[in-house]
Amino acid sequence: MKLQGQKNYKVWDSIDFDGLKKDILNNLQYKIVRDDTILCIFSVQFSDPYIWRDRDRNDAIYLHRIVVNPLYKGQNQFLKVLTWAQKFARSNNLDFIRMDTWADNQKIINYYRSFGFQFIENFKTPNAAELPIQNRNLNVALLEIDVK
């Protein structure tokens, strides 16, 4: 997050470390590793009702907190995440892969669209205690890809 902030990319003001620990314990946090080096980390959810609202129908895997090690940027780490998510979704009879990102970062939105994600809408997340602190009151772009 620090490096992204230094490069003028928007970053979270804070992060819910207890939530991260819970995701790890619940096997919802993943990493791509090569030779003991972490190349990329990401988390998944199977429900995201506060952000996806009426579209959240138990038919999707939601990708969150995708972070690529800066030393491995530009080496298709996201493609590895997406390929894994597509296989997982298909083998679990899920129809979509969904994610959200900063609404005002057209560069990252276009990047995800280049992989086939469709822009659904911009949305301001609620200030709900059920959301992790870093996900409250954000303007996000909602993206999804059909994997059927």
Predicted regions and their residues:
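C-terminal "cap" of GNAT-fold acetyltransferases
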Residues: 102-104, 115, 125-148
